[in-house]
Amino acid sequence: MTQTKIIPIFPLDLVLFPRQELPLRIFEPRYKQLVDDCMLGDGQFGVCLIDQSNLVNGWNAPKATGTIAKITKCEDVEMDGLQLHIETVGRNKFQIKKIIPPSLAPPENYDPYTVEGHNIISELHEKFGTGEKMYIQAEVELIPEIDDDISLEKWQNLVSLWKNKIVTQALPQVVELHSLDHVLEKYYLTTDMPTVDYVYSLSALGAKDPNDLQPILESNTIEQLLYNVEKLMTVK
């Protein structure tokens, strides 16, 4: 039987890949509670792309496949403690098996960017009980890593597709190929020994929308991964 566990979920407008670094500024009370709980536990939560077609108790719902984020640093932004800055790094991918809704629905006209919004949520949280979780949780199943190697030939093909996509999308402006080589150098993507992580990073460079990266994250075999990245890089 496959083992599952319950983790906090942070829906975001981005896709986090394994071993990628992700800095976040935390200001909403529900996500400050999430970070506080993580710091008291194993320092891990799930990052999922927002599912624009669904809500969970009135809040943005997560896509079903995400990545565990491990908090590596946490500090207050200001002395008032209203904002936190955390640094995280991606770990395993996971599949959501069951959503556990948050205790609170968003209040009418709730604005998380204001002090008033913070006060309203805090008052509601005290009313419902401070032991209740304001954030989404989920029962998740961890997804095994892709262990297969990527041949240099396949990697060079992906790089060529990426370059062609950038050059074509820039028209009528001319993009010199050597400038794209500099971009690859900047992101440490010049290699003779490519790995899955290189493919993830190149995909991020080739995507205009985070939704374009979700199929990449959902790829669980090397064949699926290469197919979806080639599809992403192909100019339509």
Describe every region a protein language model picked out:
Residues 1-236:
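N-terminal low-complexity, acidic/polar interaction/targeting segments
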